[in-house]
Design a protein with these regions (language model features):
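Glycine-rich, low-complexity intrinsically disordered segments
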Residues: 1-118, 122-153
Length: 153
């Protein structure tokens, strides 16, 4: 049992067995530094205007991949919600009294707990990006960075 699997389910929630093996691999390319130590402290949605400054610390090997990023205003940040359960298929959201399928929600409980936030880029200093608009716990693994969809280099 993993740490996340020990969480108590809400009424009307359902789990399934997860596969024994993964279909693909990925590398975490850095870590996200935020003011929140626990999921309960995180906002439900990041605020790119009034949210706190957060830092994305990219592994030094990927430094050259930041070329051209400093000129961007907004970035899409993809990250791995590493403490989330991966076996929940029906959930009882905080705003309702009944269950919905996981794919109908933006909950962190997902088979592949990938999250996406559109953030405001404040500055780039070496391998550290300072941004606003994140909603994850401190130390969350970084999966990828992309410019806002629709913007060309």
């Amino acid at each position: 049992m993993t740490l996340a699997a020990s969480e108590t389910l809400r009424p009307h929630e359902e789990c399934v067995p997860v596969p024994d093996a993964f279909d693909a691999g990925l590398w975490f390319i850095g870590r996200i530094r935020t003011p929140w130590a626990q999921r309960a402290e995180c906002p439900r949605r990041g605020d790119p205007v009034n949210g706190p400054d957060c830092r994305i610390v990219l592994d030094a090997r990927w430094l050259s991949a930041l070329e051209g990023v400093a000129g961007k205003d907004r970035m899409q940040v993809l990250y791995w919600m590493h403490l989330s359960r991966r076996d929940v298929v029906r959930q009882n959201p905080f705003f309702g009294d009944g269950s919905l399928g996981t794919f109908a929600l933006r909950s962190p409980l997902r088979p592949n707990p990938i999250a996406s936030s559109l953030v405001r880029l404040l500055r780039v200093e070496g391998n550290v990006l300072t941004v606003r608009g994140l909603d994850c716990i401190d130390g969350t693994p970084l999966v990828d960075l992309k410019p806002e969809f629709g913007l060309l280099p």
